[in-house]
A protein has these predicted regions:
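Glycine- and small/polar-enriched repetitive beta-structure motifs of secreted/surface proteins
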Residues: 1-197
């Protein structure tokens, strides 16, 4: 009786193993499988992501044309369609759809949310969190709109050349086109508070 029980257990284990080995080649998470890693600690996934990467290191491009023109830039992360598409600057992070779209030489920028910092060209050390936050920052290309922080949808949206501004809340300082240095704004677009230091 003991021998019969042992044979049944062995047969069951054999059948389970056979089924597993038969199914393993057909199981895949995605098709086609991810491309894997590239030289210099770089990762790319998506149509034309990191297409023109040169000697740049530590870049991650995920999404359609993400970091397309990266060249020799370093330590950039673009996640989402069109993020950092023209970027050649360093240390930028863009997550969403078309964040830092026109950024070329700007560095140390962070954009999270649809069209956040989308028109920034050469300004640096800006943070925008929320849809359309700081959307027009440095759209003149002069590189003067630096050290700005915009948190909330449409916060600091119209800023072109103002520097050292902080806007927190939906629409905060959204209409300030050429803000003076160190403006602070909080609240929604209906209740806009601002304070210049």
């Amino acid at each position: 009786m003991n021998l019969l029980v042992e044979l049944k257990k062995a047969a069951l284990v054999f059948l389970v193993a056979l089924v597993c080995f038969d199914l393993v080649p057909t199981i895949q998470a995605v098709s086609p499988p991810p491309d894997g890693c590239y030289p210099n600690y770089t990762t790319a996934e998506g149509c034309n992501a990191l297409q023109h990467l040169g000697a740049g290191i530590g870049n991650t491009g995920v999404g359609w044309y993400s970091l397309f023109s990266a060249g020799n830039s370093n330590f950039n992360t673009g996640v989402g369609a069109g993020t950092l598409v023209l970027n050649t600057g360093n240390d930028n992070t863009a997550v969403g759809f078309t964040e830092l779209l026109l950024n070329t030489t700007g560095a140390d920028n962070t954009a999270v949310g649809t069209d956040a910092l989308a028109l920034n060209i050469g300004a640096f050390t800006n943070t925008a969190v929320g849809s359309f936050a700081a959307q027009n920052n440095d759209s003149s290309g002069a590189g003067h709109a630096n050290f700005n922080t915009a948190v909330g949808g449409f916060a600091l949206q119209a800023n072109v050349d103002g520097s050292e501004n902080t806007a927190v809340g939906a629409g905060a300082l959204g209409l300030a086109k050429r803000g003076r240095p160190q403006h602070r704004g909080w609240g929604g677009s209906r209740r806009l508070h601002h304070h210049a230091q």
